């Protein structure tokens, strides 16, 4: 058994990773997942089985997540031109070129934290740049 697990699972296998990790961990298991992962009846079944997440942190800024093999390990910049350019009007359009710095991503992500045996409500917050949690405060009165 281990105290903690932090992982970015292959997204098609996330449910299997959650099931397995919750069995292995004494403390907590945290997963970086697309926000849309929550919106599924399959997830409700998983939460009934392993318990609901203790915490969800939505990444307020969309991270760039190009495949690591395309990034220079020292500079963090692209080490090659986009290998899959699209043709538009007879011209190749590249998403990036060698030496470019990755920009913002197009997908919303979140950290989901499971604690074995947790039965309370799920706490949800947002992380901004630098990993700082921004507390949710209602700015208008409910109707």
Go through the PLM ranges and name each one.
Residues 1-143:
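Class I S-adenosyl-L-methionine-dependent methyltransferase catalytic core
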């Amino acid at each position: 058994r281990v105290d903690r697990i932090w992982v970015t699972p292959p997204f098609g296998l996330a449910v299997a990773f959650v099931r397995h990790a919750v069995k292995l961990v004494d403390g907590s298991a945290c997963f970086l997942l697309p926000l849309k992962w929550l919106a599924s009846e399959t997830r409700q079944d998983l939460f009934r089985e392993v318990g609901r997440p203790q915490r969800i942190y939505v990444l307020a800024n969309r991270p760039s997540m190009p495949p690591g093999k395309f990034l220079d390990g020292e500079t963090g910049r692209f080490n090659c031109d986009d290998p899959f350019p699209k043709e538009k009007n007879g011209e190749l359009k590249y998403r990036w070129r060698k030496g470019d710095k990755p920009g913002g991503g197009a997908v919303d992500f979140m950290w989901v934290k499971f604690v074995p045996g947790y039965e309370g409500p799920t706490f949800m917050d947002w992380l901004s740049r630098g990993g700082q949690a921004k507390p949710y405060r209602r700015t208008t009165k409910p109707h």
